[in-house]
Swiss-Prot record:
CDD domains: Chorismate_synthase. Gene3D superfamilies: Chorismate synthase AroC (3.60.150.10). It is an enzyme of class 4 (lyase). It catalyses: 5-O-(1-carboxyvinyl)-3-phosphoshikimate = chorismate + phosphate. FMN binds at R123, S124, S125, N241, G242, G281, K296, P297, T298, P299, S300, R322. It comes from Helicobacter pylori (strain G27). This reaction introduces a second double bond into the aromatic ring system. Pfam families: Chorismate_synt. NADP(+) binds at R46. This is Chorismate synthase.
Length: 365
């Protein structure tokens, strides 16, 4: 499937080296002021070619809105948008057109469909994630109207982990590092991987919070069984290229703790800790929503690797092209967009949870 969401639905299309990639965002309420500066800034954050720590492929990533916006406001109809591919170099992939690149989707796409677009991975390329960032910008505009903001940064590159989380610093950092003190060591780890024609994995931290410091997030976003907020977050992020694990709150560490250590105690002012990551019973509890997305090392490395071709013959694969040495860096921005899309979808879903909400809408007329 190529669609994410239920009430706010994003459908994407296009391939890495096709003429365009694009999306249709259906379910966006009317009357939302389109923040073009926000849209442009989000695309630039994800953009490659800005420094040595990301892919040299630098696309313009100008978002062409084709429908759903009139006089700078959303109309309530589907928002269609296109992003042109202008910097593709398909010749870089001629030598692997009949080979399966190790740990890429080539093998599975070929066996599932019997045909594959070998140019940059086609539909399986992370180039598609630019669409999710554009759609996430629209979702952010919706969330801003009700006082919710999402932000992200890098907490780990290889084994080098942040000890302090500063989201303001992440916005200024070349690698979106959350910890200024650990940033140089993390950069060195990436540079060493590049020097050795290798790549490295990383972990992104994404959070949602109230825009106002003295307010909480809405309680009750998500549903208790088949639309759990944490499940939908994990589903969205696991659908992103290279993500191999997603944690909410304490995540994996929870399995090492006792109940007396893990439980979030409460008083009249609220929760005394946030080990649950802002989600209880599949619904938001008002605290910050805390998510970690674990990215594998970029599978495109410039070392000879053993593989097979489409005829099952063993051979050697030596890649060319332009690739991210650490996909977690730009991936953190995409995860932030995905969290925004999921929360916007859940906000719209929540309108159906109480008859009072519907009465408020329809009794106004």
């Amino acid at each position: 499937m190529n669609t994410l969401g239920r009430f706010l639905r994003l459908t994407t299309f296009g391939e890495s080296h096709g003429d365009v990639i694009g999306g249709v965002l259906d379910g966006m309420p009317s009357g939302i002021k389109i923040d073009y500066a926000l849209l442009e800034n989000e695309m630039k954050r994800r953009q490659g070619g800005r420094n040595v720590f990301t892919t040299p492929r630098k696309e313009d990533d100008k978002v062409e809105i084709t429908s759903g916006v009139f006089e700078d406001f959303s109309t309530g109809t589907p928002i269609g948008f296109l992003i042109h591919n202008q910097r593709a170099r398909s010749k870089d992939y001629d030598n692997i057109k009949n080979l399966f690149r190790p740990s890429h989707a080539d093998f599975t796409y070929f066996h599932k469909y019997g045909i594959r677009d070998f140019r940059g991975g086609g539909r399986s390329s992370a180039r598609e994630s630019a669409i999710r960032v554009a759609a996430g910008a629209f979702a952010k505009m919706l969330l801003k109207e009700i006082g919710i903001v999402c932000e992200s940064g890098i907490i780990k590159i290889g084994g080098i982990e942040a000890k302090n989380y500063d989201f303001n610093h992440a916005l200024k950092s070349e690698i979106f590092a959350l910890d200024e003190e650990q940033e140089e060591a993390q950069k060195t780890a990436i540079q060493n991987a590049i020097k050795n024609h290798d790549s490295i994995g990383g972990v992104a931290l994404i959070r949602a919070r109230s825009i106002k410091t003295n307010q909480k997030l809405p309680i009750g976003l998500g549903q208790g069984l088949y639309a759990k907020l944490d499940a939908k977050i994990a589903e969205a992020m696991m659908g992103l290229n290279g993500v191999k694990a997603v944690e909410i709150g304490k995540g994996v560490e929870s399995s090492l703790l006792k109940g007396s250590e893990y439980n979030d105690l409460m008083n009249q002012k609220g929760f005394l800790s946030n080990h649950s990551g802002g989600v209880l019973g599949g619904m938001s509890n008002g605290e910050e929503i805390i998510v970690k997305a674990h990215f594998k090392p970029t599978p495109s490395i410039f070392q000879p690797q053993q593989t097979i071709d489409i005829n099952n013959n063993e051979c050697e694969c030596l890649l060319k092209g332009r690739h991210d040495p650490c996909i977690a860096i730009r991936g953190s921005v995409v995860c932030e967009s995905l969290l925004s899309l999921v929360l916007a979808d859940m906000v719209l879903l929540n309108l159906t949870s109480k008859i009072e909400y519907l009465k408020t809408i329809y009794n106004e007329n």
